[in-house]
Swiss-Prot record:
Post-translational modification as stated in the protein's UniProt record: Monoubiquitination of Lys-124 gives a specific tag for epigenetic transcriptional repression. Acetylation occurs almost exclusively in the MAC.
Positions of the UniProt region annotated as Disordered: 1-23
Xref: PANTHER family: HISTONE H2A (PTHR23430)
Protein name as annotated: Histone H2AX
Main location: nucleus
Source species of the chain: Tetrahymena pyriformis
C-alpha cells in the first residue's frame, strides 16, 4: 500500500495507475520512444529536448498518411486494390510539394512517369486535310 503525506495524496504508484506511452499521450501512431532513441544514438546533437521526438514523429506520421492517401487514390484510379511501388511513385511525382521534397529519391520498381513530347504525337489536323483533298481529286 502507498503511504500518504500531509497533503493527503498518495505517494508513489497506485494499483490503478498504468503506464501510458508518449505516443499515446500525443495521440500518434508512430513510436515517439523509438524516434527519441534514434536521435540520441545518432549523435545529431549533444542534448535532445523532450518535445523534439514528439514533433518529429508527428511530422513523419503526417507525411506517411499523405503519401498513403495519394497512393491509394492512384491504385483506385488503376482499378487495383493493393498499393504497389508504382502507385507510390505516381502519387509523389504528381503532387507538386511531395515531388519537390523527394526530388532526388529513387523508388525501386516505381518506373517512370508517362510523358510523350507533344511534338512527337501525330497531329490530327494534317490527317483530316489530306483526306479531304484526296476525295476532291477523284
Amino acid at each position: 500500500m502507498s503511504t500518504t503525506g500531509k497533503g493527503g495524496k498518495a505517494k508513489g504508484k497506485t494499483a490503478s495507475s498504468k503506464q501510458v506511452s508518449r505516443s499515446a499521450r500525443a495521440g500518434l501512431q508512430f513510436p515517439v520512444g523509438r524516434i527519441s532513441r534514434f536521435l540520441k544514438h545518432g549523435r545529431y546533437s549533444e542534448r535532445i529536448g523532450t518535445g523534439a521526438p514528439v514533433y518529429l514523429a508527428a511530422v513523419l506520421e503526417y507525411l506517411a498518411a499523405e503519401v498513403l492517401e495519394l497512393a491509394g487514390n492512384a491504385a483506385k484510379d488503376n482499378k487495383k486494390t493493393r498499393i504497389v511501388p508504382r502507385h507510390i511513385l505516381l502519387a509523389i511525382r504528381n503532387d507538386e510539394e511531395l515531388n519537390k521534397l523527394m526530388a532526388n529519391t529513387t523508388i525501386a520498381d516505381g518506373g517512370v512517369l508517362p510523358n510523350i513530347n507533344p511534338m512527337l504525337l501525330p497531329s490530327k489536323s494534317k490527317k483530316t486535310e489530306s483526306r479531304g483533298q484526296a476525295s476532291q481529286d477523284i
